[in-house]
Amino acid sequence: MAGGTALTPTSVGSKSVPMRNHEATERGNTNNNLRALPKAVQPVSSIEGEMAKRPRGRPAGSKNKPKPPIIVTHDSPNSLRANAVEISSGCDICETLSDFARRKQRGLCILSANGCVTNVTLRQPASSGAIVTLHGRYEILSLLGSILPPPAPLGITGLTIYLAGPQGQVVGGGVVGGLIASGPVVLMAASFMNAVFDRLPMDDDEAASMQNQQYYQNGRSRPLDDIHGLPQNLLTNGNSASDIYSWGPAQRVMSKP
């Protein structure tokens, strides 16, 4: 119809129904908007289910990066080593330990011993200090002491032993002579490379400190190895030998602060 609104026929069933152009345009826009809507968000419960199904840990076959090996080429000078020493029958225990300390250049601290000895020469701990020689076979109850490689100050090394006799008597004292093993003797000892010699007691009052400081300023301190002739490896204790001094006419040995 001229001058009227254009109509577009549509089919409803078997009949054609005219539809206006603007109505068709609006319906087309509506369909486009529906297609542009985002998809429905997945429920949180389903997401948690998927996360729970994921395997934990590293993927199969994954490994750490290899670390470079740590190689210790020598012992620390201040290390303390445990030694189990077996001494054969017929050997002098004191001479064997002294030879071991000299060859290894390590000091020994004897902690315990098991076995039997014979022909023991002891200095009794009584005030008389009598020296006795025990003949026969005695079982070791206790063996304590220290052995240092030469040169070492007199009186700083030695062994003290307590023995059980065949009749059950107990004797003991400082070993001053032979100590012959009667069968295998096993000792537990701690060995060390460094030792520091100190003379005690040290004066801590203010007057002694001022006096020591005065001697230090006057350059009258002397290294310990010049006084006692100790080997260098038994003096350092990780520091230089100059860190150890003797102070004053009383020959006190103190460490530099």
Swiss-Prot record:
Single GO cellular component term: nucleus
Disulfide bridge positions per record: none
Location(s) in or outside the cell: Nucleus
Region (Disordered): 1-71
Consequence of gene loss (knockout): Abnormal pollen wall with the absence of the nexine and intine layers causing microspore abortion and male sterility.
Alphabetical keyword list: Activator, DNA-binding, Nucleus, Transcription, Transcription regulation
PROSITE patterns reported for this sequence: PPC
DNA-binding region, residue intervals: 53-65
Domain of life: Eukaryota
Domain spans labelled PPC: 77-214
Pfam families named in the record: PCC
GO BP: any one term: pollen wall assembly
Annotated tissue distribution: Preferentially expressed in the inflorescence meristem and young floral buds, as well as in seedling-stage vegetative meristems. Widely expressed in flowers, roots and stems, with relatively low expression in leaves.
Subunit structure: Interacts with FVE/MSI4 and MSI5 which are components of HDAC corepressor complexes.
Other remarks in the entry: AHL16/TEK knockdown results in late flowering phenotype.
Domain free text: The PPC domain mediates interactions between AHL proteins.
The protein, known as: AT-hook motif nuclear-localized protein 16
Source organism per UniProt: Arabidopsis thaliana (Mouse-ear cress)
Gene behind the chain: AHL16
